[in-house]
UniProtKB/Swiss-Prot annotation:
It catalyses: an L-alpha-amino acid + O2 + H2O = a 2-oxocarboxylate + H2O2 + NH4(+). Glycans are attached at N58, N393. It comes from Siganus canaliculatus (White-spotted spinefoot). InterPro entries: Amino_oxidase, FAD/NAD-bd_sf, Flavin_amine_oxidase, Flavin_monoamine_oxidase. Substrate binds at R117, Y403, A492, W493. Its cofactor is FAD. GO terms for biological process: amino acid catabolic process; defense response to bacterium; innate immune response. One of its GO terms (molecular function) is L-amino-acid oxidase activity. Keywords: Antibiotic, Antimicrobial, Disulfide bond, FAD, Flavoprotein, Glycoprotein, Immunity, Innate immunity, Oxidoreductase, Secreted, Signal. This is L-amino-acid oxidase. Belongs to the flavin monoamine oxidase family. FIG1 subfamily. The lineage of its organism: Eukaryota, Metazoa, Chordata, Craniata, Vertebrata. It is an enzyme of class 1 (oxidoreductase).
């Protein structure tokens, strides 16, 4: 589950998308110009807000936050500290949302089923982690001793890095000798040229209509084999139909040139750390079914798991931090605007599946592997080796034996856990040998498309959705505000959820101060 963006006023219709995806700043090179387009111009301001806190209010103001994920917890902390009375309502039996860690306390190991890594430039997340006492350790993204198993060929990563042609993709002569990432970066030259010549907004207006595949094939002119190479080796094959901008974000944040950390002991320790600084009610097992607005406030009606009747909570404002799809299961009275409902319905959510296999030993260490990933064009796709061990169990091996997205993930939805275990083992045997089969002791599977609280893994825009829906997803409607990773960029990251929460909390606080008569002019939504 990073972008850096400036406040965009609701009146700035022309900025509809500059929203964050492309919001420009001059830089010293073409590459830096494109990088600048991917950053929030208000990032420093957001970081300053969490460090300094929001201006304190003078009157009692009750805010109900729907959802106890990272966005909800972040907003709760800011609003609580500013003097608001906060209540969090969460449908699940736990906090954290898509930060979920499976823990086998009996055997002394854990596995992150959702968010698992933090890029080095996610300063807002890292500030909270430090403040909350959450420890981080390096997440090893790349290990040269891992493997590629594609086109029926098994090769060590270091041999592929030395000679990409060894994988036998039938690329054109002009494409030979280039890695998948080099091919992709070269293909972006027309986007970079557009940014340098006309700015970020012009580039967005011109290229938001393209899917990744359409751009790479029709504009950049890559061969079909180069496309297949990029899809296989950058884990983008199943994402070729999504917006070009999403692929640019993805490769900017998930690549071997970015440094990462992970939460020591499991990512769920991060949301759990908020409990030590929050003094607000958190109502678990409480599913919001209706949000009713009036001139005097809002009424949030939720159903507790053990009760048939609804319970009403009266508040001054509500902040909805669920996924866009989960929000569709709530009744809003009066109805949300047509544009808001269209955005919630239409925004594309990706699928993601993780298959965790446990072993009686860490067999990959015999191959000289610590951390990193092996890549295959078989159903497992990406295999991640752990960057940590377990103090309570020095022998157990816990492997993310398959990490898939989009259509690669959808392929796995109908299979049982046991079937997925056998599928992942078959692929591992082809890479590490038959010996691993006898070492396997168990399986844990997480299919985010089947999660009854998120209804998907994370937002991932298709062509035109940046221009059509990005601003609308964040926009408040009266006393009802919205936040979550789907309302910020880049999608899927914990910090993006936090950035949206800071913006929403700031807007709620400004609206409260306005009602106190401290400001003369209405404060529009800031994104």
């Amino acid at each position: 589950m990073d972008l850096h963006r400036a406040p965009w006023k609701s009146s700035a219709a022309a900025a509809v998308l500059l929203l964050a995806l492309f919001s420009g700043a001059a830089a010293s090179s073409v590459e830096k110009n494109l990088a600048a387009c991917l950053r929030d111009n208000d990032y420093d301001q957001l970081l300053q807000t969490v460090q300094d806190g929001l201006p304190h209010i003078n009157t009692s103001n009750h805010v109900v936050i729907v959802g106890a994920g990272v966005a909800g917890l972040t907003a709760a902390k800011l609003l609580q500290d500013a003097g608001h009375r906060v209540t969090i309502v969460e449908a699940n039996s736990r906090i954290g949302g898509r930060v979920e860690t499976y823990r086998n306390k009996e055997e002394g190991w854990y596995a992150d089923l959702g968010a698992m890594r933090i890029p080095s430039d996610h300063s807002i997340f890292r500030w909270f982690a430090k403040t909350l006492g959450v420890k981080l350790n390096p997440f090893i993204m790349d290990d040269h001793n891992t493997f590629y198993f594609v086109n029926g060929l098994l090769k060590r990563t270091y041999t592929v890095e030395a000679n990409p042609d060894i994988l036998n993709y039938k690329v054109r002569s002009s494409e030979k000798g280039k890695s998948a990432n080099t091919l992709f970066q070269d293909a972006l030259q027309k986007v970079k040229d557009e940014v340098e010549a006309h700015g970020c907004r012009a580039a967005l207006m011109k290229y938001d209509k393209y899917s990744a595949k359409e751009y790479l094939k029709e504009v950049a002119g890559l061969s079909s084999e180069a496309l297949r190479m990029i899809g296989d080796l950058l884990n983008e094959q199943s994402l070729m139909y999504t917006a070009l901008s999403e692929m640019i974000y993805d490769q900017a944040d998930v690549n071997d040139n970015v440094q990462y950390d992970e939460v020591t002991g499991g990512t769920d320790l991060f949301p759990r750390a908020f409990l030590s600084v929050l003094d607000v009610p958190i109502l678990l097992n409480s599913k919001v079914q209706r949000i009713r607005r009036s001139r005097d406030g809002v009424t949030v009606s939720f159903k507790e798991s053990q009760r048939s009747s609804l319970t009403d909570l009266h508040a001054d404002m509500v902040l909805v931090t669920t996924t866009a799809k989960a929000a569709l299961y709530m009744d809003f009275e009066p109805s949300l605007s047509i544009r808001k409902m269209e955005a919630l319905r239409a925004v594309h959510y990706d699928s993601s599946t993780k298959i965790i296999l446990t072993f009686s030993s860490r067999f990959w260490e015999e191959d000289g592997i610590r951390g990193g990933k092996s890549i295959t064009d078989r159903p497992s796709r990406y295999i991640y080796y752990p960057s940590h061990t377990f103090p309570a169990n020095s022998s157990v091996g816990v492997l993310l034996a398959s990490y898939t997205w989009s259509d690669d993930s959808l392929l796995l939805q109908a299979a049982s856990d046991e079937e997925l275990k056998e599928m992942a083992l078959r692929d591992l045997v082809k890479i590490h040998g038959e010996r691993v089969r006898a070492l396997c002791t168990g399986v844990v599977v997480k299919k985010w498309s089947l999660d009854p609280y998120s209804f998907g893994a994370f937002a991932l825009f298709t062509p035109y959705q940046h221009l059509e829906y990005a601003k609308e997803l964040f926009r408040s409607e009266g006393r009802v505000h919205f936040a979550g990773e789907h309302t910020a960029f880049p999608h899927a990251w914990m910090e993006s959820a936090m950035k949206s929460a800071i913006r929403a909390a700031t807007n709620i606080n400004k609206q409260t101060l306005l009602n106190e008569g401290m400001n003369e002019c209405p404060a529009p939504d800031e994104l």
